[in-house]
Amino acid sequence: MSRVYEINVAKSKFRDAYNAGNLDGLLAVFADECTDMSAGAPSFFGADSKSVFRSRMTRLFEECRATLTVTVIAIRVFANTAFDYGWHSLTLMPRDGGKPITTRQRYFETWQRNSNGEWKIDFYIDNVDVAPMMPGADLPIPLAFCPPDTQRQRDQKLARAM
């Protein structure tokens, strides 16, 4: 079995566990010592990362039914290390009957092959996807690179345009 195929199988287990609300199945895809840099949340490292992830996902699965669609753009393998990147489209249906919420995130993961030959995610980072634009378009400057005054001016300009 090819290593790329093995990563695809592990990624499918990730998706299937997410969609089933299977916390143990979801956590099984992650290394015991990992890094989580999920958008909109503090970063966590090592054993704390998996513990915090467990708490977050327990709450999420209690409050919502989740439907995760994974689009893998590429998987690159280098011996016992690999990375993949793509999109996660997540629809959350509140269990209390509220309206569903759908988000699309760009993600990047690194994988390590452990001593049992299993591929585990040891680094995860994502951010909100944005609409594609042509290179010649009036591309926005990422807010992370803007001084606070520029952000404020940009927010005011956007508010006037709405």
Features from the language model and the residues they span:
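A solvent-exposed, acidic/Ser-Thr-rich amphipathic alpha-helical stretch
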Residues: 2-10, 23-80, 87, 102
